[in-house]
């Protein structure tokens, strides 16, 4: 039986809107049990779909199993079972991990008034101190039970069907928001009433036994919206539904949930937020909303701003708000495979971001997110769910944590990092039913910590040499092997062909010697870098001797909506530099010479629609680039050495005339922003930051200790030590969300 039980014309809009999202979503409906009344609420909004099974090696246990797990009501000893579980949500507070899901009982006879279908919100409680074997043992016992938190069993009106539990915590309080409606039997079918938002708050109490089942005491159910609250929104919205997943507690303590809504015109689904600045006593709707036909929002906080990811008709987008949803700014520019350039009608919902949370690991604030991709060696009907970590400069591909069967639908999951553990609550199929399983991502967390440690070490090292680290995405230096030039930040390696390893780089000694660094080219199993219309690539090169003719040194290949565009720096036999910055491929020879055996610094820069080439920190040439500025660069690659492009003239190779190229390329730095001349000079000079001599010890009368900084504000203290090279960059870029959005595989923010 389908999870959805409604057929109103109002919410049918939501189904139509979200079913347009892709083939995977549409398949959910085709696999639903036809015995259930059609649902407009989340028949396609949620679209959680199914999993073909887990990924080998994961620690996983089933928490909620259809027709097996006993569910206790709030009052009374009589338990019951559910037919299926949907919409996972996961939180932790006061030493208790609480896993939530919709629990559905399906009617076998939709034309029988006595067989009324319903759904409620159920929860399972786990002691966060349990080791994994203990957790598995407890959950596997016959006494393991789930608990009803919000549903008709409590005798409340408009709770026949409760959908999309959305949770967050503040202190020892758990906030649960859900959508609800009642059912009435009219003309031999079930009809739903109007949608309502219900909130219930639980207090985590001190343990009275070894079991966590009584640790959360739930309060009274509260309706969140009234006429004045809705009228204040000014968007003429009429019905609201919780988004599911996770809410957010902002740095200032504001509690935020994401919602979906329809307006009086019934012209599509809108996404927005509801928030409380007084610990849940009163609530306000955001004035701003997403465009029509953009639903299933996920939200997270980053440096005081809200990020909201929405699923639209043909793509996935991200919006940012710095004023609690009064205004939402769409980020411009996306990664390949996400957005309008690769819509869901052609690739389904692959490469879409799913769960998204902001956490602090090892003292570093990062975002964790899951994203579907392509499984190498798998059929087109399967795609793994990947886990990623980003720190607003760079992202790291951790690995697959689930496998999606694209024929049946899509995975739904919720991430939680708490008490030193990383968990994933995930819905997966079990025949006709859906199971909620919990995974503890122990090995994945170890890898994340190792990567974050590497990032910190590299930042400190480069800063000690006065090299700017703000916006530094990747570095190619001394690490190499197996035909690869390893990125020091572990994000993306370059591929090297017929080159000799030297200190900090490679020497290109053959006619076909080259090093290729591909970015913005999606590959499900490759760690990638994501750039938009702002970047700088800086490298050190030594030309050992003059070539026989014009020889490419550094090429960037860009593809926007139109034909390919090339940025190229070459060197000539008469010791001149040559630039090519036009798609007509007409090179310009510069009078400035290169010197054999001397280390030169070369740089390619793209700033909006302006492409520039620099040598030794001085501008060699620049041109306007025919880029739209509205779409991401679909193909983007850097190449050192023999990188032939269409239109290159056939010339006698150095081998044919007895002369081979000899160019050494070392220390390549890639930034997701433009650099100024001072910063490029700092990279070239690499002046160590002087260490301060020990201060003389002077005895001073003790003073009262200053109050400790408020918890959660540790990110306001930022690393320095780059000899001033980062000064301007920090103010200009330090808090810009652009790099973060690109790394996520979403619409990038063009201007802060």
Swiss-Prot record:
Ranges of the BNR repeats in the UniProt entry: 274-285, 319-330
Segment forming the signal sequence: 1-23
UniProt record, GO biological process: ganglioside catabolic process; oligosaccharide catabolic process
One cellular component term from this protein's GO annotations in UniProt: intracellular membrane-bounded organelle
Single annotated GO MF: exo-alpha-sialidase activity
Protein family membership: Belongs to the glycosyl hydrolase 33 family.
Name used for this protein in its record: Sialidase 85-1.1
